[in-house]
Every structure is written in structure tokens, then in C-alpha cells.
Curated annotation (Swiss-Prot):
The gene coding this protein: alg10
Gene Ontology BP, a term: dolichol-linked oligosaccharide biosynthetic process
Keyword Transferase tagged: yes
InterPro entries membership: Alg10 (IPR016900)
Disulphide bridges, residue numbers: none
Organism, scientific name: Aspergillus fumigatus (strain ATCC MYA-4609 / CBS 101355 / FGSC A1100 / Af293) (Neosartorya fumigata)
Residues passing through the membrane, by range: 10-30, 65-85, 94-116, 131-153, 176-196, 200-217, 272-292, 313-333, 360-380, 407-427, 510-530, 577-597
Origin: domain of life: Eukaryota
Keywords per UniProt: Endoplasmic reticulum, Glycoprotein, Glycosyltransferase, Membrane, Transferase, Transmembrane, Transmembrane helix
Protein name: Dol-P-Glc:Glc(2)Man(9)GlcNAc(2)-PP-Dol alpha-1,2-glucosyltransferase
Enzyme Commission no: 2.4.1.256
MF-aspect GO terms: dolichyl pyrophosphate Glc2Man9GlcNAc2 alpha-1,2-glucosyltransferase activity
Glycosylation sites: N574
Polar residues: compositionally biased ranges: 474-483
This protein's pathway: Protein modification; protein glycosylation
Length: 614
């Protein structure tokens, strides 16, 4: 039976509820404006700078601001449009500027995320499911660090929006007419993303450029059937690419894929360079800015010197696990537990290749590397330990409470968390393959009789009743002979159909994980500070490319017979999505309440309320 996602009233209700739930974003901003009307924390720098631009003082710049002026230009455009249409605002305060962030978070970002997610599904040749797409977009917009800063005047929302828009145009330019014009628009949106935040270079140039290289190589090469490392290198120079599905890839397969990409890339060097020209233009523009600015950050250079902070690539895994456990928990249970103990409601029917914990030798390679990073490269920025208003202050307080804790986190939070997060790209299933039955004499007779009926109907339209009756009786007398397939042939057909189905579904492959990891690492390891905001774009890209939650096996084998069964199937399939929604709402309610109503004072600043935040 088909493995299409079941549709019932509950999924459609979730889809239509999305705009109403997104109203929480302006409501959150309104509450912040009531309780915290004045600029808070980084807003103290951003709000006066935006006000200077509003007064057309374009050359005024606060030397403490580290990011480019894109946020202030965005606010200027929206506020100028509002002034023309409504006659206000004539002067900008924190509330008016926060509203420009809300416009991005509640209107433009959901729209462009929906467009991007739909495009990604179509590129993968899968049927878009409107309810699932809309619910996924909603959950991304409710992602707690993203939701929290949507009510404040920070750069994160508009920065993410620019990256998403660049991704949309990168997909558009690969298909259809006017590709040159679309490429120019993509380059413009990519440069716009850099005007909002410097680290966006790793997403609009490295990430999107890497995906373009992989697409080009896959289009111009054949799939490699090699297994050994030497064979993979040789097949690469024969234009055969080794790139297994994430669901079938081991740790060593990622090493093989890296080597295969290099060898196939060398064979297709000129076409790759041509296809990456737009990304190279963006990289060149960024390089020119760095040379002109004598560094990456604009202000406070003494506190934001670039370095190698490898521990960031350890912290990201518990970060993802904390926020995304609702969509990870049941697939992970399917991976580690035998099918016999999993309730049918949550049994996804994963294959043997998908199931199981990481292999021992994988742990023996990865865990010592992680321990070495913890020992030699744990960097704690002075700002982290000096500011108890951020939750990350208390995380590091726990890690520093005993020397053994930071090492104990390696096999549990870092290694297992990383395995679960990367495995999530392979949480996909395929529909059952048609079962072929060898044709026997009774089968031949049934097939012949079926053919007779079709033939008789066709003859009836073309000839007289008498001649038609004669021809039909002749066909009845001699049923057509049919060849019998051997079991070996049937097995090969089954295997071929299974491979074709996987190719059509096009779930993430090892090459995508490598590109995503590269962009994530480059954007994080160069940052000395550990801030939850820095992980937003890596999380969003991870969340966008996760395959849909698997349909339980019992509902793939048999279609729901009535509305009640359809409701049960829909609940089982979308249960994780709803859990994610409720989890995000709970976190947002808790952190919002703490921010607004659980303030405290510093002894050195009496009378001034300090507030907890991400």
C-alpha cells in the first residue's frame, strides 16, 4: 500500500491554526513594550543607531556595534513606508523598531520558509503535504531563541530571513527561464545577508555553494558501487560518485564520501568552477570587506578576535537535543529497541541498516577526539562569566562545578547527542514494494480471461455484433501463453524497484551532512562567545532538511478504513510535531515570564532591573 501521509481533520485544523498561533509574536512584543519600554541590553546600541539613520545621519556609527547596518536599513524602509501610508511614526522609539522585527518574524519569515520548504520537497520529487509543511514552518517560528528575540530589536530575525531568501533564489535560478536574472537576484540577496551579519557568508556562499557542487557532481556522474577506499578513489576518477543515504551510512561512509567528492570533483573541475561563480562573487565581496575593515567585526574588535573554538561543535548537540527531543525521541527508540517491544502506534518499521547504536569502533575514534577538544580547546570568554543575565552563564557554572563534569558530558551529551541529531536526517521509510507471484496455469487462465474481456469490449466498438462474437470466441479458444519468471529475476526486479523508490524520495545523503557540518563548523568555531543565538541558523537548516516524520508501519501496510482509523493514523504520524509545538510554547511561556517578571538588581547598579534571557 502507499505510504502517503494520512490526512484527517486534525492535520487540516493545525494548518489553518498557523496564522492564529503566529499572533503570539506581536502579542509577545506588546507585552515586552509594556513591561520593558526602554531599550534593554544590546538594544541600547541598536536603537540609537537606527534613530541616527532615521534622522539621515548616515555616517554616524557607534564603535561598540560589531555587526553591519542591515538591520537599521530594514527598519528605515519599513518605517518610511508606514509613514507614507499612515503618517506615523515620525520619531522612532524601541517599540516602533521592535515592530519591524515582528513584521519579519510573523509575516515575511513564515511566508519565505513555506516557499522554501515547498521548493525543497518538490526538488526531492515528493508530494508536498500542506498541513505538514505549515506545521513545520510554525514550529520553526516558535523555536524559543528565535521567538524570544522576535520581541526585541536584535539582528537575528532579519539575518535569518535574508539567508532564507537567498536560499529561495538559489533554488529558483536552477530551473526555468531567465536564469541569468535570477542568478543576479541571488547574488544581491546573498550580499544583503552579509550586510546583516558577517557569519552569513558561511551559509549563502559555503553552504549553498557546497550544495550546488554536490548537485553538479551527481548530475554528471554515476552512482559508485565500490566498497573499499581504493576502489572509491579509482571509481571517482571514472566519474562515479559514492554518496549513500544517511539512513544507510556509517561513520566511515562519510570519510569515503568526502574522498569520493574530491576525486569526482577533480575530474569535473572546470564545470564546478563555472557553476560556483555566483558564490565566488559573494566570497570575493566579503574578502574585500575584510581587507577594507582590517577584520571581520566592525566594533569592539579587542573583545571579538577570531580564533579556533572547536568546543562549539560539541555544545551544538545538547543544544539540539534539548529543543528537538520531541521529534527525535520516538525514531531513536525505533533505532535502539527491537520491534517486538515497540508499540504498534510508534513502530516505524525501520530497516536493519537503520537500526542500532553507533558501532564500538566509531566511539573509539570519535570520543577520544571529543575528549581532546574538551581538554585543550575549552574557551570561556570573559563576557560569559561576567554576565549572569544569560542562561549560558549557568550552563558553564555547572560544567565548571567539578573537573569531571565537562569530561562526563562527552560520551553522553556530545557523542550520543551528535549521533541522534545526524541520524535524524535518515529517519525515513519507504512504502512496501509490490510482491510478484510466479504465473501458474490458473494465473494464466485468469489473465487470459481478463484479456478476453478487454479485447471483446474493443471489438464491440469497431465491428458488427455477429463478427465481434466470432472473434471473441476465437480468443476464448486460445488464451495467450505467458512466460514464468524465475525467483532470481523477481528478486532483481524487487531490488531495482526499491532502489528507484529511494532515489525518487531523495532523502538526505552523506554529502548533504558533510556540507551542513562544514558550514555549521565555520560559522561557530570562529566565534569566541557561546551564545544560543549563534546556533539558530544551523538549527533552522537542520530542521528544514529533516524528512517528514515516518508513518507507523501499521498504517503503511493498510489504508485507514474509516474516519476513526484516519484520525488514529494522523495522530500517530503527527504526534511528534504536536509535541514539538507544545514544548516550544512551554519554553516560550517560561522564559517570557522570567524575563518580564523575575528581574533582579546588581549591587553596582541599584534601582536598575536586570532580566534573564537567552
Amino acid at each position: 500500500m502507499s505510504a502517503v501521509r494520512p490526512v484527517s481533520g486534525i492535520s487540516l485544523a493545525a494548518r489553518y491554526a498557523v496564522p492564529f498561533v503566529l499572533l503570539l509574536i506581536p502579542l509577545w512584543m506588546a507585552k515586552v513594550n509594556t513591561v520593558v519600554p526602554d531599550p534593554y541590553l544590546d538594544e541600547v546600541f541598536h536603537v540609537p543607531q537606527a534613530q541616527a539613520y532615521w534622522d539621515h545621519r548616515w555616517f554616524h556609527w557607534d564603535p561598540k556595534i560589531t555587526t553591519p547596518p542591515g538591520l537599521y536599513i530594514w527598519s528605515y524602509i519599513l518605517c518610511a513606508a508606514a509613514l507614507v501610508l499612515r503618517g506615523s511614526p515620525k520619531e522612532l522609539n524601541a517599540g516602533a523598531l521592535r515592530a519591524t522585527n515582528v513584521a519579519a518574524a510573523a509575516v515575511f519569515l513564515p511566508w519565505r520558509l513555506q516557499t522554501l520548504l515547498d521548493a525543497l520537497r518538490k526538488v526531492r520529487n515528493t508530494r508536498p503535504s500542506g498541513a505538514w509543511l505549515s506545521h513545520t514552518v510554525l514550529n520553526i517560528c516558535l523555536f524559543p531563541p528565535l521567538f524570544f528575540f522576535s520581541g526585541l530589536y536584535y539582528t537575528d530575525i532579519v539575518s535569518l530571513l535574508a539567508v532564507i531568501e537567498a536560499y529561495n533564489w538559489d533554488i529558483k535560478r536552477s530551473a526555468g527561464s531567465w536564469s541569468l536574472l535570477k542568478t543576479a537576484v541571488f547574488v544581491a540577496t546573498g550580499l544583503t545577508a552579509l550586510v546583516l551579519r558577517q557569519t552569513n557568508i558561511f551559509w549563502v556562499a559555503i553552504f549553498l555553494g557546497g550544495l550546488q557542487v554536490v548537485r553538479r557532481l551527481r548530475q554528471s556522474s554515476k552512482a559508485s558501487q565500490a566498497s573499499s577506499l581504493l576502489q572509491i578513489i579509482q571509481s571517482g576518477f571514472n566519474n562515479e560518485l559514492y554518496d549513500p543515504l544517511v539512513s544507510e551510512a556509517s561513520f566511515f561512509d562519510y570519510v569515503k564520501t568526502s574522498i569520493s567528492l574530491v576525486s569526482v570533483g577533480l575530474r569535473n573541475f572546470i564545470p564546478i568552477i563555472i557553476s560556483t561563480v555566483p558564490y565566488l562573487v559573494i566570497l570575493a565581496a566579503f574578502g574585500g570587506f575584510v581587507l577594507w575593515n582590517d577584520g571581520v567585526v566592525l566594533g569592539h574588535k579587542e573583545f571579538h578576535t577570531a580564533g579556533l573554538h572547536l568546543s562549539q561543535m560539541l555544545y551544538i548537540w545538547p543544544y539540539f537535543m534539548f529543543f528537538s527531543w520531541p521529534i527525535l525521541i520516538f525514531p531513536v527508540i525505533n533505532l535502539v529497541l527491537p520491534n517486538s517491544v515497540i508499540p504498534a502506534f510508534f513502530d516505524y518499521g525501520f530497516t536493519k541498516k537503520q537500526k542500532g547504536l553507533p558501532r564500538i569502533w566509531t566511539a573509539l575514534v570519535i570520543i577520544p577526539i571529543m575528549l581532546a577538544v574538551v581538554h585543550f580547546n575549552t574557551i570561556i570568554h570573559p563576557f560569559t562569566l561576567a554576565d549572569n543575565r544569560h542562561y549560558i552563564f549557568y550552563v558553564f557554572r555547572i560544567l565548571r562545578s567539578h573537573p569531571a563534569i565537562r569530561y562526563a558530558a562527552v560520551p553522553t551529551a556530545y557523542f550520543v547527542g551528535g549521533w541522534a541529531v545526524i541520524s535524524a536526517f535518515g529517519f525515513s521509510t519507504t512504502k512496501p514494494q509490490p510482491q510478484f507471484v510466479p504465473i501458474t496455469k490458473s494465473n494464466e487462465l485468469a489473465a487470459a480471461q481478463k484479456g478476453q474481456l478487454k479485447e471483446a469490449a474493443r471489438k464491440k466498438e469497431k465491428s458488427e455484433r455477429k463478427s465481434k462474437s466470432k472473434k471473441a470466441s476465437q480468443v476464448t479458444a486460445s488464451p495467450p501463453a505467458q512466460d514464468q519468471f524465475s525467483p532470481e529475476v523477481l528478486a532483481r526486479i524487487q531490488e531495482h524497484l526499491a532502489q528507484r523508490q529511494k532515489q525518487q524520495q531523495e532523502v538526505p545523503r552523506a554529502s548533504f551532512v558533510l556540507v551542513w557540518l562544514a558550514a555549521t563548523a565555520l560559522s561557530l568555531v570562529t566565534a569566541p562567545l557561546v551564545e544560543p543565538r549563534y546556533f539558530i541558523i544551523p538549527w533552522v537548516m537542520w530542521r528544514l532538511h529533516l524528512p517528514p516524520q515516518p508513518v507507523p508501519l501499521v498504517y503503511r501496510q493498510q489504508r485507514p478504513r474509516d474516519e476513526r482509523e484516519a484520525l488514529h493514523a494522523d495522530l500517530a504520524t503527527n504526534f511528534s510535531l504536536f509535541m514539538e509545538t507544545y514544548w516550544f510554547l512551554a519554553i516560550n511561556a517560561a522564559t517570557g515570564y522570567i524575563f518580564l517578571y523575575k528581574g533582579f538588581e546588581w549591587p553596582q547598579e541599584p534601582g536598575k532591573v536586570q532580566r534573564f534571557m537567552w
